[in-house]
């Protein structure tokens, strides 16, 4: 399966990249077929984190003078939006560091556990097409963070691109990759959970012991799923808030470039700047929708009930066990643990609510920005 091979290559490349960038102290061991802890990687990891947090002050000083005076009609308002964006990046960096310190080992252990269930218990041969396409889409969005062409050409025609511009953009790219690396790990765990639940539901069982084994495995997977949601809950919440704000600022920036087409900002490369702004906006919206689709797929697999084996359907003990499993599933489905921060009992309306929120705030911020001072 060509898409499956491409998915495996993307996974290996992503795992290698996060090691180079210092986002993980675990590496994949092909011999043991699991993630393995390394003290050397942990030292390298924490060194880069300290440097990253220490460099924030220089980035903040640069960001305060990023937009030149007279570049926008409402320069003061633009500077306020820019300042909020910078401090939200700091919040994301601190949250990511905190979660990295608390949960990295648990996340890697969970990944190893799911991989073991898929390979040994469920005899996985090839991932489903949905798994491959969803993961490739997420990895594409992750690599899109390398693109800082818009900020690089923002001053085109006003001043030359210098070393500080390059360093500041690399810092922004690094923090964007750090944020999305954790989100990719979250999506990867959700996809593995969905695959495990799907394959477990397809297992054939002709005896009572087979049914019991299937039900116990299912309950184990559901417990893993609740644990994953709890570990990533705050990061996902903060990341979604940041992305809505960033898209709002992107709308404002695009509108400004459009409305000031005869001003200094529009003298050079206006069409290219507008195109890059639209691409940035759409990629973020697609990333949010992708998360919703994956969560919806996982919930669909969780809500399926294992079939009772036909040849022992008359067995009172077997039928009662199946009935109790269905009852436990109904209780768990409405449990607060499945509703962490209100984000994990999702349907597609939630995705479009986020999109609508981003567009609405974009319109409001444009109106505020152009109120005569």
Swiss-Prot record:
**UniProt entry keywords in alphabetical sequence:** Cell membrane, Membrane, Receptor, Transducer, Transmembrane, Transmembrane helix
Q: Where are the transmembrane segments?
A: 9-29, 83-103, 133-153, 171-191, 231-251, 274-294, 351-371
Annotated compartments: Cell membrane
Q: Which GO terms describe its molecular function?
A: ligand-gated monoatomic ion channel activity
- For this UniProt entry, which residues form the secretion signal? none
Give residue spans on the Cytoplasmic membrane side.
1-8, 104-132, 192-230, 295-350
> Where is it predominantly found?
membrane
Specify whether Glycoprotein is a keyword of the entry: no
Which Pfam families does the annotation name? 7tm_7
Its Gene Ontology biological processes?
chemosensory behavior; male courtship behavior; monoatomic ion transmembrane transport; sensory perception of taste; signal transduction
What highest taxon heads this organism's lineage? Eukaryota
Which residue ranges does the entry give as Extracellular-facing topology? 30-82, 154-170, 252-273, 372-373
Write down the membrane topology.
Multi-pass membrane protein
Q: What does this protein do, in the record's words?
A: Probable gustatory receptor which mediates acceptance or avoidance behavior, depending on its substrates.
Q: Which family does it belong to?
A: Belongs to the insect chemoreceptor superfamily. Gustatory receptor (GR) family. Gr10a subfamily.
Protein name per the record: Putative gustatory receptor 10b
Say which species the protein is native to.
Drosophila melanogaster (Fruit fly)
Q: What is the lineage of its organism?
A: Eukaryota, Metazoa, Ecdysozoa, Arthropoda, Hexapoda
């Amino acid at each position: 399966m060509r898409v499956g091979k491409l998915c495996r290559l993307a996974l290996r490349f992503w795992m290698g990249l996060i090691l180079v960038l210092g986002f993980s102290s675990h590496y994949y061991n092909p011999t043991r077929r699991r993630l393995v802890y390394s003290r050397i990687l942990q030292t390298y990891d924490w060194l880069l984190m300290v440097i990253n947090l220490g460099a924030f002050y220089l980035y903040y000083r640069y960001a305060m003078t990023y937009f030149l005076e007279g570049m926008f009609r409402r320069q003061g308002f633009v500077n306020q939006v820019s300042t909020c964006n910078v401090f939200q990046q700091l919040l994301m960096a601190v949250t990511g560091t905190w979660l990295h310190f608390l949960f990295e080992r648990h996340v890697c252990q969970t990944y190893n556990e799911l991989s073991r269930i898929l390979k040994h218990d469920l005899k996985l041969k090839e991932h489903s097409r949905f798994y491959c396409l969803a993961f490739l889409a997420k990895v594409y969005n992750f690599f899109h963070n390398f693109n800082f062409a818009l900020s690089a050409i923002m001053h085109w025609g006003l001043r030359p691109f210098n070393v500080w511009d390059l360093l500041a953009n690399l810092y922004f790219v690094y923090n964007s990759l750090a944020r999305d690396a954790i989100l990719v790990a979250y999506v990867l765990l959700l996809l593995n959970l969905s695959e495990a639940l799907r394959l477990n539901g397809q297992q054939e069982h002709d005896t009572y012991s087979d049914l019991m084994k299937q039900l116990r495995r299912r309950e184990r997977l559901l417990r893993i799923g609740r644990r994953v949601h709890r570990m990533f809950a705050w990061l996902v919440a903060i990341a979604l808030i940041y992305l809505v704000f960033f898209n709002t600022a992107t709308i404002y920036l695009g509108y400004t470039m459009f409305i000031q087409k005869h001003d200094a900002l529009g003298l050079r490369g206006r069409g290219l700047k507008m195109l890059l702004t639209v691409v940035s906006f759409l990629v973020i919206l697609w990333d949010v929708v992708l998360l919703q689709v994956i969560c919806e797929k996982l919930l669909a697999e969780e809500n399926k009930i294992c079939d009772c084996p036909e040849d022992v359907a008359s067995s009172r003990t077997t039928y009662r066990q199946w009935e109790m499993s269905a009852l436990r599933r109904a209780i768990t489905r409405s449990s607060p643990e499945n509703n962490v921060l209100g984000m994990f009992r999702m349907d597609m309306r939630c995705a479009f609510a986020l999109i609508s929120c981003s567009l609405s705030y974009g319109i409001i911020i444009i109106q505020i920005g152009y109120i005569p001072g």
